[in-house]
Design a protein with these regions (language model features):
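C-terminal beta-signal and adjacent terminal beta-strands/loops
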Residues: 377, 486-498, 525-579
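Solvent-exposed loop segments that connect transmembrane elements
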Residues: 1-30, 67-123, 167-178, 216-233, ...
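Transmembrane beta-strands of outer-membrane beta-barrel pores
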Residues: 59-63, 73, 157-161, 209-213, ...
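Structural signature of Gram-negative outer-membrane beta-barrels, strongest in the C-terminal barrel
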Residues: 44-48, 193-196, 202, 208-210, ...
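Membrane-embedded beta-barrel scaffold of Gram-negative outer-membrane proteins
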Residues: 140-144, 150-166, 313, 319-329, ...
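Gram-negative outer-membrane beta-barrel transporters
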Residues: 257, 375-377, 398-496, 576-578
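Transmembrane beta-barrel wall of Gram-negative outer-membrane proteins
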Residues: 1-67, 135-138, 185, 196-210, ...
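Repeated loop/turn-to-beta-strand initiation elements of outer-membrane beta-barrel proteins
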Residues: 50-53, 148-151, 200-203, 254-257, ...
Length: 579
C-alpha cells in the first residue's frame, strides 16, 4: 500500500496509526480469508419393520476476517450529492484529522485499501473479524402404517451467533465503522402424510410450524460529529405456520396432472432502541418516544399459494411439461432503522409464474437436452433503495414495495458424452425484465432517451460450459482433468430512479458490474478402491477482476461507492476420504 498523500501535515491532531506513519509499503491486516471447521453426525435406528428414527447434529465454527470490501469511487466535488462529505471535511475531517476525506484514498489495486478499525474520537475498536458459531439438532420419525399410507414427523432446532466488524470508507479516518453481534434461534416442526390412492394418485398433505427469535446489537459511527455515533439493539420474533396438500394423478400411462395448494400465516414483531455512545438518548423523532424507548413494528399476513401442471411422456426419450405456480415472500422491516420514519414495514411480494418446456435424450443417451421457457409476474416486489434525505428527514435506505414487474426468459441445459470418458456440459440463460408499474417505489420505467431502466441483480445473459476427460491408470486409479468457463452479462446491484446516473463520464451509472467470464480448472485423482480422491484446483485462472456486489452511496449523499471484490487467481488442494 503506498504512503497516503497529505497525511501528517501540522493540522493533524489525532494519530491515525501505522497506516499514517509508514513511509513505505505496509500490510497491517487482511480481508476475505476463509477459516471454517464443521462436522455432522447422523444416527439411523430401525425401531421396527414399520418405524425408522433418524437423529442428526451439526456444528460449525468460523473465525476469519471480514469480506474483501473495496472503496472504488469517490464523490464528484461541487455537486449536490457531495454536500454532506464536503461539510464533514470542513467541520470535522480537517480540524480533527488534519486531512480531508477524498480520492487520495483510492488505491491502484482492487485488493488494497487504507481501512483501519479504530475510532480515535470515541476510543472504540471495531475488530476486523467475521465469526460464526452455529449448531443444529434434528429428529425424524417415519411410520409406514400401510403400503398406501406413510406418516413422518420432523423436529429441528438451530441457533447461531455471528460477530463482525467492518469499515467501508477505504481510509484510516473513522468515517463509517460498525460492530455487529447477531443472534438467531429457531424451532421447526413438520408433519407429512403421504400415500397412494386409486392406483393412480400419489398425494402429500402436511403441516409446518416455525418460530424464531433474532437480535442484533450494533455499535456504529457514521460521519461522527455530523450524523451519529450510536449503539442500537434490535430484536425480532417471527412465527409462521402452514398447511399444504399436493398430488400427482396419472390420467394415463403417459399424461399426469399435478396440483397443490398451501396456506401460510406469517407474523413478525420488531423492537427497536437507540442511544448515543455516552448512553444518553438520541433526539426524539417520530415513531420513538425517545431513542432508548423501544419502538414496536408488527406485521401479519396470510397467503394462499396454488399450483397446477401437466407433463406428458411422449416416449422414453422425450417429456413435455407445462406448469402454473404461485409463491410469496413474507414482509418485514427495513434493517437497522435510524429514525421513526423508517419504522414502516413493507408487505409481502407475490409471484405468478408460467413455464413450459421439454426434457429429452438423444443418440442412445449420449446427449441430454432440456429447455424451459418462463413468464413471471411480480406484484408488490420488494426492492432495497436509497434516497437523498427529503424535508421529512427520512432515512436514506429503506425496503419498499414496487408495483408490478414482468420477467420472461429461456433456460437451456445440455450434457453430452460424445466418446467414452469425455463429458461436456453447458447451460444458457436469457431473461428480459420490464417494470410495468413502479407503484410508490420511485423506480424509473425508462430513461429520458427511451432506454428501459435496469432490473436489480438480474444479468440478461448467462452462459457456462465445461468439459472433463477420465484417464484410466489401471491399478493406480483414474485421473480426470476438468475445465469450466462461466459468463455473466452486465448486472446492476441497486434499483434506480431516472435521475441517478446517465452513464456519461461526469455522472456515471453507479453500482454496476460489467459482463465478465471466469475460468476454473481442476485435476482429480481417484484411488483404485475409490476410497480416496485428491483434487488440485485453480479458481479464476485468467485472474479476472470483478465484483460480487456493489453498494453505490454517491447519489444519496454518502460520498463513495464500495464493492465486494471477488478473489484473484487461487490454487488449492482438497483431499477426501470416503467411508
Amino acid at each position: 500500500v503506498p504512503p497516503i498523500p497529505g497525511l501528517g501535515f501540522p493540522g493533524l491532531s489525532i494519530d491515525l496509526g501505522s497506516a499514517v506513519n509508514e513511509t513505505g509499503n505496509c500490510v497491517v491486516d487482511e480481508l476475505g480469508n476463509e477459516n471454517v471447521q464443521s462436522g455432522r453426525a447422523m444416527l439411523l435406528w430401525h425401531a421396527s419393520p414399520e418405524i425408522d428414527v433418524t437423529l442428526s447434529a451439526d456444528v460449525t465454527h468460523q473465525h476469519q476476517k471480514g469480506p474483501a470490501d473495496k472503496y472504488v469511487r469517490y464523490y464528484r466535488p461541487g455537486t449536490p450529492e457531495a454536500g454532506l462529505s464536503e461539510f464533514w471535511n470542513f467541520a470535522v475531517g480537517v480540524p480533527i484529522f488534519g486531512v480531508a476525506w477524498d480520492d487520495r484514498f483510492l488505491t491502484d489495486s482492487p485488493y488494497t485499501n487504507y481501512n483501519r478499525y479504530v475510532d480515535p474520537v470515541s476510543g472504540r475498536t471495531f475488530p476486523n473479524v467475521n465469526d460464526v458459531d452455529e449448531y443444529g439438532i434434528a429428529g425424524a420419525v417415519e411410520w409406514q402404517i400401510s403400503p398406501e399410507l406413510n406418516i413422518k414427523s420432523i423436529t429441528a432446532y438451530r441457533e447461531f451467533k455471528n460477530s463482525f466488524g467492518r469499515t467501508s470508507s477505504g481510509s484510516p479516518i473513522p468515517l463509517d465503522l460498525t460492530w455487529d453481534v447477531t443472534r438467531h434461534d429457531q424451532l421447526t416442526q413438520e408433519f407429512q402424510f403421504t400415500g397412494r390412492a386409486f392406483d393412480r394418485l400419489d398425494w402429500t398433505a402436511g403441516f409446518f410450524y416455525y418460530t424464531a427469535d433474532d437480535s442484533n446489537y450494533q455499535s456504529g459511527s457514521l460521519f461522527p460529529g455530523v450524523i451519529y455515533q450510536q449503539d442500537s439493539h434490535d430484536t425480532q420474533d417471527a412465527t409462521n405456520w402452514a398447511v399444504f396438500v399436493h398430488g400427482v394423478y396419472d390420467i394415463t400411462d403417459q399424461l399426469a396432472l399435478t396440483a397443490g395448494i398451501r396456506y401460510t400465516d406469517d407474523e413478525k414483531n420488531a423492537y427497536i432502541s437507540r442511544h448515543n455512545f455516552d448512553g444518553t438518548d438520541r433526539l426524539p423523532v417520530p415513531g420513538f418516544t425517545t431513542q432508548t424507548s423501544p419502538g414496536l413494528v408488527p406485521i401479519a399476513e396470510t397467503n394462499w399459494s396454488p399450483t397446477v401442471g401437466l407433463d406428458y411422456q411422449v416416449n422414453d426419450n422425450l417429456l413435455l411439461f407445462a406448469f402454473y405456480s404461485t409463491g410469496f415472500r413474507g414482509g418485514g422491516f427495513s434493517p437497522r432503522p435510524a429514525n421513526g420514519l423508517q419504522l414502516a414495514n413493507f408487505l409481502s411480494e407475490n409471484l405468478d409464474n408460467y413455464e413450459g418446456g421439454f426434457k429429452s435424450e438423444w443418440f442412445e443417451h449420449r446427449l441430454r437436452l432440456n429447455t424451459n421457457v418462463f413468464f413471471s409476474i411480480y406484484s408488490d416486489q420488494q426492492v432495497f433503495r436509497g434516497d437523498l434525505p427529503d424535508a421529512s428527514g427520512a432515512q436514506w435506505f429503506h425496503q419498499i414495495n414496487s408495483g408490478e414487474s414482468e420477467y420472461w426468459g429461456v433456460e437451456v441445459e445440455a450434457q453430452a458424452n460424445p466418446i467414452e470418458n469425455l463429458m461436456i456440459d453447458s447451460t444458457l440463460g436469457y431473461i428480459h425484465h420490464e417494470l410495468t408499474d413502479p407503484g410508490f417505489s420511485g423506480q424509473c420505467v425508462e430513461f429520458a432517451n427511451g432506454d428501459p431502466c435496469y432490473s436489480t441483480r438480474t444479468p440478461e445473459f448467462t452462459f457456462a460450459i465445461g468439459g472433463s476427460y477420465e484417464f484410466n491408470l489401471g491399478d493406480r486409479g483414474t485421473l480426470t482433468p476438468r475445465i469450466d468457463a462461466r459468463y455473466q452479462s452486465k448486472i446492476y446491484f441497486l434499483p434506480y430512479t431516472a435521475d441517478l446516473g446517465n452513464n456519461v463520464a461526469s455522472n456515471p451509472i453507479e453500482g454496476v458490474q460489467e459482463g465478465y467470464t471466469v475460468v476454473n480448472g481442476r485435476i482429480t485423482w481417484v484411488s483404485p478402491s475409490t476410497d480416496w480422491d485428491v483434487q488440485l484446483y485453480a479458481v479464476n485462472l485468467t485472474d479476472k477482476v470483478y465484483f460480487n456486489g456493489k453498494l453505490p452511496l454517491i447519489g444519496i449523499g454518502l460520498g463513495r461507492e464500495q464493492g465486494n471484490v471477488a478473489p484473484p487467481r487461487e490454487f488449492g488442494v482438497t483431499v477426501t476420504r470416503h467411508f
